[in-house]
Amino acid sequence: MSKKVLLGMSGGVDSTVSAMFLKEEGYEVEGLYMKLHSNPGYHEIHEARARKAADFLGIKLHVIDLQEIFNEKVFKPFVDTYAKGKTPNPCALCNRSLKFGEMLKFAYKIGADFVATGHYIKTDGKYFYEADDDTKDQSYFLFYVNKEILPRLLFPLGDRKKSEIKELAASINGLATFASQRESSEICFVETTYTDLLQDYVEVDKVGEVLDTSGKVVGEHKGYMHYTIGKRRGFSVNGAHDPHYVVSINPDKNQIIVGKKEDLACNSVVLNNLNLYSDEKSFDTTVKLRYRTKAIPCHVDIIDDKAHVTLKESVFGVAVGQAAVFYDGNKLLGGGWIEDN
């Protein structure tokens, strides 16, 4: 008897071709479209695409509404993190709670043996590994997935190139339209800018003071939630001739502190809410502090459920609230959330 796989289907080329690969490998495939955020127009388009793909491939498509859970687990933390002057990473939270949380629960319900997605990542059932296509690798966003479920996960695209996937889809009658769809690289529930979305829930536009690193008022800004660490535009600095960057944010006083690029240098971080795939308490490894950045050599000490990370070279513009993800070569070792820099 063939093994049953529940495949997350978004209506995009990656999940569509993943379904085709899984069928070719002999799996019994059923699709799942998850309604996450409350954007009817978005779902109308993407659910229709997912259904078109499922019909073409001859697989059953389930549709479930997860908006309430998404709001609690992803959207509210997104708003709260910005309100605290930090920079959130909603995709990592969504992957843990919904795409590999609620989806796995649904897989149990229908008797599926595995869960699959079109993510560009690899796994051997014990660890995650970076995808072969380093321009599309999504391992950074999956660091928070519970390690106990790795044996149940399949990623058909982990050893493929994105260009290969699009070329294959383009060559098949019935799938060519999926190859030509415009890709979305932004947060799926943010239609324009994150501040446009936030202003429906919190006061975003509120003029405040710009301070230099000595505490002197040197200008004004349009509201602290418009800024993230390292930003260099959108505020005034009286008499400045050189570029100034946001080096910290004080949400309680609606202030941003700015300085020169060297003031952004960071040599250590502290991480909380850890998700580690190793039990080691002190080790040397590498860490990525943002998506699509190089891994920095570091030393890690786990003390009282927090990771104290000493960087072996300076990194500029490290944002509190973002994910820090550990790698041993291309092997993902887990990570945590930047609490202090």
UniProtKB/Swiss-Prot annotation:
Mind telling me which GO cellular component terms the entry cites? cytoplasm
State the source organism's domain of life: Bacteria
Q: Where in the cell is it found?
A: Cytoplasm
Q: Which reaction does it catalyse?
A: S-sulfanyl-L-cysteinyl-[protein] + uridine(34) in tRNA + AH2 + ATP = 2-thiouridine(34) in tRNA + L-cysteinyl-[protein] + A + AMP + diphosphate + H(+)
Task: List every stretch annotated Interaction with tRNA.
Answer: 136-138, 290-291
Function as written in the Swiss-Prot or TrEMBL entry: Catalyzes the 2-thiolation of uridine at the wobble position (U34) of tRNA, leading to the formation of s(2)U34.
- State what protein this is by name: tRNA-specific 2-thiouridylase MnmA
**Protein species of origin:** Sulfurimonas denitrificans (strain ATCC 33889 / DSM 1251) (Thiomicrospira denitrificans (strain ATCC 33889 / DSM 1251))
Upper lineage ranks? Bacteria, Pseudomonadati, Campylobacterota, Epsilonproteobacteria, Campylobacterales
